[in-house]
């Protein structure tokens, strides 16, 4: 009888080579896409629908900005691939695990030194997260204070950058720690039939995140100010009343303290009241009609049940991942290859980790690397679904009579954000969650004022 678990649990399977190969293949594929996009940026002509909307100076700046981001993307990908290969080649996971155990033994009283694998996993992930943050500091610094600064977008100070990082790590430990503990305890409690318990748990976490993050977490990083009474507020409330949108409050967020990029969105569970959030950069630079048109698009996502659709898709994606994980999560050869053993028969491994139970967190992290080919394919699917949603939301705003103002707002945002004008189709189908501006304007049947005249 065909038993996938037994077939995969074989000491001769080169797990390190497989994961390294998948990682290199993903890097090569994504680098190829970036190369295609970089070549596309050499084009000196705008898409026809943008010819009367974008001046030469803006087009030139946009091309330079996009090229700089493409180069940085390649460097970042090389940097991240090198990290992954170093971790695999030099068995850094068991080394960090030993550090975690030593830290626990140093902190806890002697009688608690034989701590559980779950406790060791939590400490391991805390150390790994801290190490990853430190290793990624140069990339983060360059992104904000060199690349974004060069093109006039960065408003961050070094002090605010460091403060944000400390807050993020603190929240990750304070909130992520208990969530991870419960996640691992499910495997501990239900080692053979964890799938449905994990599904329910992650669904609850997702719903709580959608509820808690906008109301309690995001205000720790930005100031949310109620929109003042006036023309804009009346226009938004009138739109909400017209379409039956369950509007609760409208806030303006001080996004300008970090970046000059603009955005607008709403928060709230699918069947509850909603909060609309406007970036101050949007409020200060766009007309009332344009902002209302942008929100008509956002409300289109609500009216078309896109949030519900994405939650369902997310759950199906999660189910697929954990269904596949059942075939390998207790695979002895898989853990042994990376230095984790349940007994002392460690062969030639120099500094093995001996645990009472399978360290699920290690297995899941490495398993995600095995999923690289599947996740690359899923990326195309997720981008397609998201782009379809954007077209539908645009069509909804057009149906409400906001076509021209939405187009003007999209063009204005494109100019102010120096967004890419010419995009390679394969690159965008993988990386872009939104259609390009040219694609959206074409779908909306936009005709510039110059051509009308």
Curated annotation (Swiss-Prot):
The chain crosses the membrane at residues 13-33, 90-110, 122-142, 168-188, 198-218, 307-327, 358-378. GO terms for molecular function: metal ion binding; metalloendopeptidase activity. Zn(2+) binds at residues 297, 301, 390. Residues 34-89, 143-167, 219-306, 379-453 are cytoplasmic. Gene3D superfamilies: Metalloproteases ('zincins'), catalytic domain (3.30.2010.10). InterPro entries: CAXX_Prtase_1, Peptidase_M48, Peptidase_M48_N. Binds 1 zinc ion per subunit. CDD domains: M48A_Zmpste24p_like. Its EC number is 3.4.24.84. Residues 1-12, 111-121, 189-197, 328-357 are lumenal. GO terms for biological process: CAAX-box protein processing; ERAD pathway; negative regulation of post-translational protein targeting to membrane, translocation; peptide mating pheromone maturation involved in positive regulation of conjugation with cellular fusion; post-translational protein targeting to membrane, translocation; protein processing; response to pheromone. It is a multi-pass membrane protein. The active site is at 298, 394 (proton donor). Its cofactor is Zn(2+). It is an enzyme of class 3 (hydrolase). GO terms for cellular component: endoplasmic reticulum; endoplasmic reticulum membrane; mitochondrial outer membrane; nuclear inner membrane. It catalyses: Hydrolyzes the peptide bond -P2-(S-farnesyl or geranylgeranyl)C-P1'-P2'-P3'-COOH where P1' and P2' are amino acids with aliphatic side chains and P3' is any C-terminal residue. Keywords: Endoplasmic reticulum, Hydrolase, Membrane, Metal-binding, Metalloprotease, Pheromone response, Protease, Transmembrane, Transmembrane helix, Zinc. It is found in: Endoplasmic reticulum membrane. Proteolytically removes the C-terminal three residues of farnesylated A-factor mating pheromone. Also acts to cleave the N-terminal extension of the pheromone. Does not act on Ras. Present with 19600 molecules/cell in log phase SD medium. Belongs to the peptidase M48A family. This is CAAX prenyl protease 1. It comes from Saccharomyces cerevisiae (strain ATCC 204508 / S288c). The lineage of its organism: Eukaryota, Fungi, Dikarya, Ascomycota, Saccharomycotina. The gene is STE24.
